[in-house]
Every structure is written in structure tokens, then in C-alpha cells.
């Protein structure tokens, strides 16, 4: 909206700000962030405004630019340690887990439960006091053993996953693109920071040890190895067996972000709103 709003010749100039525009073109809903209730403006009705702006937008696809890369995606499953699944089950059941040293994993809202579940499924956890811990390095060990003597671009989602990769790969890992291009080291990049503007053309494969809820991130991740002279790219997704990652992947591959509504449906969680907080009645659908 802002890019059009700053131009006096563009449509929508009669709206004083985004919020006035959103009242006419967005299905505004409520969502919970921690204990706060905020308005969600993400569901814009494209069918109502696209005819106003399509004449002002120029599209140029990779195919039109001469790119003809075939992207092959392979899912590999990893058996996580029993403790990992036990913590996930208990968190769904009780919404809180206490470690042996008194640290709390708290999932008192649907958004937090969704995020904690995904993080735990890849072997790390962030406690309520802000500290993090590696509880299961199965995915990192699997990647190191599976892809020996290969040059990898490894993507992770949560910060503690980088520490897990560093502990597993040691000196075989870098986070610097220049060092990656000029050595035999693998590179580790976070989805959000590594999804845009970086070319990993020197990687043999891209490997993701987790997955982001965003469909935009999914498609930008797929393009990190694309060049005009590279005809085939192979991407590996490392998922826990029967884990939440499979459900997220199904959504983002269909160009849909994995929302909390989808999470609640997949895991049979019924959320109710009362006094700006959420309580949950649960029946697990963990396979």
C-alpha cells in the first residue's frame, strides 16, 4: 500500500493511511501474541483491488529471463531421541514442561505452542527465561554422516540450531559466504537472513534441518542455487519421523503459510477466547 500511497498519480490516494484502506480491502481478524490481542491485516482481498493496480505492475519471471533450472526436492526422515517426543507430548498435554534444573518451557497460547513444537522437533528449545538448549542433535549428526565430502548450504530456523551445527561440524562449517566460496567448508544460514540476495551456486546441495512457516521463505529458499548455467538443483529436507515439519511442508508447497489455524486443525486443538487469553482443550493427533 505504501508504495502506491506516496505517489499522487497512483490509485488509493483518497485514503489517508493504510488503516483507512484496510477497512475497505482487508478482512481484519484478531490474533494473539503472548498475552496481547492485536489486529491481523494479512488477509487482503486481492480480487477487490487487483484491477486497480495490475496496470502499474511489471512482472518478469525467471523463465522469461532465460532460467530453466529443474529443482528436485527430497525429504529424508530422522529418528529423534525418545526424550524429544516425550517433551512434545507433555507440552501438548500440560502446556508447560519443567526441566531438571527448574527452567520452564511455556506454551500458554496457540502461537507459542506451534513455535515450541517446531523447535523441539529439530532438537532445541528456548526456555521462558530466554536461554536456549540443545536436547537432541540427531538431525545434525545425520546430515554430517549422510553428506560426507559434499559441499553443503545448510539452512536452519532457530538460533540454537546454529550452535548444534557448530558443535557437530566443528571447523568444517562457516557462516561467511566468502569463506564458503573459497574453501571446502559448508555454510550455515538462517532461513530469514539467508533467503534473499545470496547465491549458493558453489554448493553441491542445499539441506534444511528445519522449515519455516512462511510460504515466501519456502520459495526463496528454493532459489538460492539457481543460476542460468545450472540446469538442476537438489534440495534436501531433514524432517523428524511423523513430525510437524511434514504438515508445514505440505502447506508452504501449496503457497500457503502454515498458520495457527492450520496447526490447531492438524493437531485437533480447540482454542477459545476469554478475557484476551486462550485456553485449550486438546486431543493429540501425534502419530
Language-model features: where?
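Catalytic donor nucleotide-activated moiety binding site of glycosyltransferases and closely related
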Residues: 159-166
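Non-catalytic, charged low-complexity extensions flanking SF2 helicase motor domains
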Residues: 234-287
Amino acid at each position: 500500500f505504501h508504495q502506491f500511497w506516496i505517489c499522487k498519480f497512483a490509485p488509493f490516494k483518497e485514503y489517508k493511511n493504510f488503516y483507512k484502506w484496510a477497512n475497505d480491502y482487508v478482512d481484519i481478524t484478531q490474533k494473539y501474541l503472548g498475552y496481547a490481542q492485536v489486529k491481523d491485516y494479512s488477509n487482503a482481498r486481492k480480487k477487490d483491488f487487483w484491477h486497480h493496480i495490475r496496470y502499474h505492475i511489471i512482472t518478469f519471471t525467471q523463465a522469461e529471463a532465460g532460467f530453466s533450472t529443474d529443482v528436485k526436492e527430497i525429504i529424508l526422515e530422522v529418528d529423534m531421541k525418545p526424550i524429544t517426543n516425550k517433551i512434545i507430548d507433555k507440552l501438548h498435554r500440560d502446556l508447560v514442561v519443567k526441566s531438571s534444573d527448574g527452567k520452564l518451557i511455556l506454551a500458554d497460547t496457540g502461537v507459542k505452542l506451534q513455535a515450541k513444537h517446531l523447535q523441539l522437533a529439530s532438537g532445541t528449545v528456548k526456555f521462558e527465561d530466554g536461554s536456549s538448549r540443545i536436547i537432541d542433535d540427531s538431525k545434525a549428526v545425520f546430515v554430517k554422516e549422510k553428506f560426507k565430502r559434499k559441499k553443503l548450504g545448510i539452512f536452519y530456523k532457530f538460533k540454537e540450531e546454529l550452535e548444534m551445527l557448530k558443535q557437530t561440524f566443528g571447523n568444517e562449517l562457516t557462516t561467511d559466504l566468502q569463506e564458503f566460496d573459497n574453501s571446502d567448508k559448508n555454510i550455515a544460514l538462517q532461513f530469514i537472513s539467508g533467503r534473499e540476495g545470496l547465491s549458493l551456486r558453489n554448493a553441491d546441495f542445499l539441506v534444511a534441518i528445519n522449515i519455516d512457516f512462511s510460504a515466501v521463505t519456502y520459495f526463496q529458499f528454493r532459489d538460492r542455487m539457481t543460476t542460468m548455467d545450472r540446469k538442476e538443483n537438489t534440495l534436501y529436507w531433514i524432517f523428524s519421523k511423523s513430525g510437524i515439519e511434514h504438515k508445514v511442508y505440505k502447506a508452504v508447497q501449496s503457497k500457503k503459510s502454515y498458520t495457527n489455524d492450520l496447526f490447531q486443525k492438524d493437531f485437533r486443538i480447540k482454542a477459545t477466547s476469554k478475557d484476551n487469553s486462550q485456553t485449550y482443550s486438546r486431543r493429540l493427533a501425534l502419530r
